[in-house]
From Swiss-Prot:
EC number per UniProt: 3.4.24.15
Domain of life: Eukaryota
InterPro entries per UniProt: MetalloPept_cat_dom_sf, Neurolysin/TOP_dom2, Neurolysin/TOP_N, Pept_M3A_M3B, Pept_M3A_M3B_dom
Gene3D superfamilies for this protein: Collagenase (Catalytic Domain), Endopeptidase. Chain P, domain 1, Neurolysin, domain 3
Localization, UniProt: Cytoplasm
Entry annotated with the keyword Lipid metabolism: no
Function as written in the Swiss-Prot or TrEMBL entry: Involved in the metabolism of neuropeptides under 20 amino acid residues long. Involved in cytoplasmic peptide degradation. Able to degrade the amyloid-beta precursor protein and generate amyloidogenic fragments. Also acts as a regulator of cannabinoid signaling pathway by mediating degradation of hemopressin, an antagonist peptide of the cannabinoid receptor CNR1.
Residue positions where N6-acetyllysine is found in the record: K257, K538
The record's free-text note on cofactor binding: Binds 1 zinc ion per subunit.
Co-factor requirement: Zn(2+)
UniProt name for this protein: Thimet oligopeptidase
UniProt binding sites for Zn(2+): H473, H477, H480
PROSITE patterns with a match to the protein in the record: ZINC_PROTEASE
Taxonomy of the source species: Eukaryota, Metazoa, Chordata, Craniata, Vertebrata
Gene: THOP1
Record organism: Homo sapiens (Human)
Length: 689
């Protein structure tokens, strides 16, 4: 066989001509979504058929690898147009049509991933091609396709392949239904004004009033978190916490059990002992034993800190019960946690979150945040007035490289809750930044979706400090999408190892704990005054408040995830309750089933929730080694970060990117110090007022 016709030298590099076209559209009817889904499947299948039916002697880079890469670019964009509206469209009909499209396309994805004929031709190409004739990223793409083929069992007997295909299709549908149930949940609880004691006026004014005069509290984040933090009526907190962790209890509990069973079956067919081992093969951690050791060691280090914090909380509860004439049961309940953790911030660190949020109107935060990111990463953002989107609240921005003026991408901001909308905060990649069929560069487009408190007649949207942190985090993912310069869609943006994917955006959370960035994105919504420096200093000092309990809870969630995907007979609710008691020291509320509300289990983080903590090892190392040492707003370090960490996307291993940015292998020291733990004789001392 001759060497492939299109080799390394023929492929365009990052300096390729750039196409600034936004191919996305959001005006499709439910019928059009259905029709376009069918058309997309037919068009894409034709390409796979052409690749899979070619004679082996005709297999070349152009006819096989490039053909698959090109169709992936088109397919990804068109698929996102069809399946993204299920998360954000204000129309229930559109959301339903989009969900159905996602199900059909997910089934089609499984069919295409199980094409043994295509796999055989990719293997043939690898055996015949001269390795040095491929550009490094093309070689990586070829290797990845073969790896994915083996992970789908395409080297196994046909009967086994059919079993795997059947399981994969069922898993896709179950995951879609699990998260659809949560998105469409409309549960609310009615309360009197007295039952909502302790909540600020702007919160109460934002609640819908019912015919009987009671106020309607939903289980969406802008209602749930403020109430759990500030309502001084324990019974109200109990009802809301219980309802929140009983959402979709029956239907999602059944789905979760089936998910866990099917994942285990598929993994065994592929020769893996557990689903966790199957998933982790592609991650930095590699094995479930490595993850278990990481979580166990961290839990052991954090437990003494958690015990101290529980003692403080219990004393706060005793004092409050005495002050309000309430019975004191001598125990911390699940509905007490956020309330008294908030009190720790207010009493030990003198941070009044209600006062603080008056300095974080969303427009001021947005302006400051965008300014910091532009300065740090050498970018310039421009708001596109009147751009079409899926809702009137949504804003579209263009991002350019500040030095060259070249467009690097676009991003949508969709910040406020709506009925039926995705209920958390997330970044959705909508158009991958990669090379098109003609060698020109397609710009990346992403959407940041959040659920911040909506403006009222009396006040703009005011953000809690933890919402500002969330904003910084998710926008970090947006920047990862836009700044990557991969050649292949498969490696664009955040397509890195799952236990590294959070590190770039976690690293950027540090800016909301630094004085200069905080001053730049805050201003009192009435007076326009800056945050008093004393309040700012107390906020920064409060970063380590409750760090033991917060991180022990993260370990609980990670361990639940690992348990479900290493022990198929584990009962999700029982496992969660056991770990809450053992690790956190706070029992789960009887009758609840938190895992049935845990969207990560059906949202691509199966056996990988540990990645949030694992990624922090790298995010803290990057921040303290470079930015903290050389300046948190140092644009040279920012450009190094853009070049070394964001630019490659998934075209390199994360370990190689980290070594290049840090100048050495990563270390855990900064991570442990950030958790309030002693490292080499240094122990951070939280300051109190």
């Amino acid at each position: 066989m001759k060497p492939p016709a299109a080799c390394a030298g023929d492929m365009a590099d990052a300096a390729s001509p750039c196409s600034v076209v936004n191919d996305l559209r959001w005006d499709l009817s439910a019928q059009q979504i259905e029709e376009r889904t069918r058309e997309l499947i037919e068009q894409t299948k034709r390409v796979y058929d052409q690749v899979g039916t070619q004679e082996f002697e005709d297999v070349s880079y152009e006819s096989t690898l490039k053909a698959l890469a090109d169709v992936e670019v088109t397919y990804t964009v068109q698929r996102n147009i069809l399946d993204f509206p299920q998360h954000v469209s204000p129309s229930k009909d559109i959301r339903t049509a989009s969900t159905e499209a996602d199900k059909k396309l997910s089934e089609f994805d499984v069919e295409m991933s199980m094409r043994e004929d295509v796999y055989q031709r990719i293997v043939w190409l690898q055996e015949k091609v001269q390795k040095d004739s491929l550009r490094p990223e093309a070689a990586r793409y070829l290797e990845r396709l073969i790896k994915l083929g083996r992970r789908n069992g395409l080297h196994l007997p046909r009967e086994t392949q059919e079993n795997i295909k059947r399981i994969k299709k069922k898993l896709s549908l179950l995951c879609i239904d699990f998260n659809k149930n949560l998105n469409e949940d409309t549960t609310f609880l009615p309360f009197t004004l007295q039952e909502l004691g302790g909540l600020p006026e702007d919160f109460l004014n934002s609640l819908e009033k019912m015919e009987d005069g009671k106020l309607k509290v939903t289980l969406k984040y802008p209602h749930y978190f403020p109430l759990l933090k500030k309502c001084h009526v324990p019974e109200t907190r109990r009802k809301v916490e219980e309802a929140f962790n009983c959402r979709c209890k029956e239907e999602n509990c059944a789905i979760l059990k089936e998910l866990v069973t099917l994942r285990a079956q598929k993994s065994r067919l592929l020769g893996f002992h557990t689903h966790a081992d199957y998933v982790l093969e592609m991650n930095m951690a590699k094995t479930s034993q490595t993850v278990a050791t990481f979580l166990d060691e961290l839990a052991q280090k954090l437990k003494p800190l958690g015990e101290q914090e529980r003692a403080v909380i219990l004393e706060l509860k005793r004092a409050e019960c005495e002050r309000r004439g309430l019975p004191f049961d001598g125990r911390i309940r699940a509905w007490d946690m956020r309330y008294y953790m908030n009190q720790v911030e207010e009493t030990r660190y003198c941070v009044d979150q209600n006062l603080l949020k008056e300095y974080f109107p969303v427009q001021v935060v947005t302006h400051g945040l965008l300014g910091i990111y532009q300065e740090l990463l050498g970018l310039a953002f421009h708001h596109e007035e009147g751009a079409s989107a899926w809702h009137e609240d949504v804003r579209l921005y263009t991002a350019r490289d500040a030095a060259s003026g070249e467009v690097v991408g676009k991003f949508y901001l969709d910040l406020y809750p709506r009925e039926g909308k995705y209920g958390h905060a997330a970044c959705f990649g909508l158009q991958p930044g990669c090379l098109r069929q003609d060698g020109s560069r397609q710009i990346a487009i992403a959407a940041m979706v959040a659920n911040f408190t909506k403006p009222t007649a009396d006040a703009p949207s005011l953000l809690q400090h933890d919402e500002v942190e969330t904003y910084f985090h998710e926008f970090g993912h947006v920047m990862h999408q836009l700044c990557s310069q991969a050649e292949f869609a498969m490696f664009s943006g955040t397509h890195v190892e799952r236990d590294f994917v959070e590190a770039p955006s976690q690293m950027l959370e540090n800016w909301v704990w630094e004085q200069e960035p905080l001053l730049r994105m805050s201003r009192h919504y009435r007076t326009g005054s800056a945050v008093p420096r004393e309040l700012l200093e107390k906020l920064i000092e409060s970063r380590q408040a409750n760090t033991g309990l917060f991180n022990l809870r993260q370990i609980v969630l990670a361990k639940v995830d690992q348990a479900l995907h290493t022990q198929t007979d584990a009962d999700p609710a029982e496992e969660y309750a056991r770990l809450c008691q053992e690790i956190l020291g706070v029992p789960a509320t009887p009758g609840t089933n938190m895992p049935a509300t845990f969207g990560h289990l059906a949202g691509g983080y199966d056996a990988q929730y540990y990645g949030y903590l694992w990624s922090e090892v790298y995010s803290m190392d990057m921040f303290h080694t470079r930015f903290k040492q050389e300046g948190v707003l140092n644009s040279k370090v920012g450009m190094d970060y853009r070049s070394c960490i964001l630019r490659p996307g998934g075209s390199e291993d994360a370990s190689a990117m980290l070594r290049r940015f840090l100048g050495r292998d990563p270390k855990q020291d900064a991570f442990l110090l950030s958790k309030g733990l002693q490292v080499g004789g240094c122990e951070p001392e939280p300051q109190v007022c």
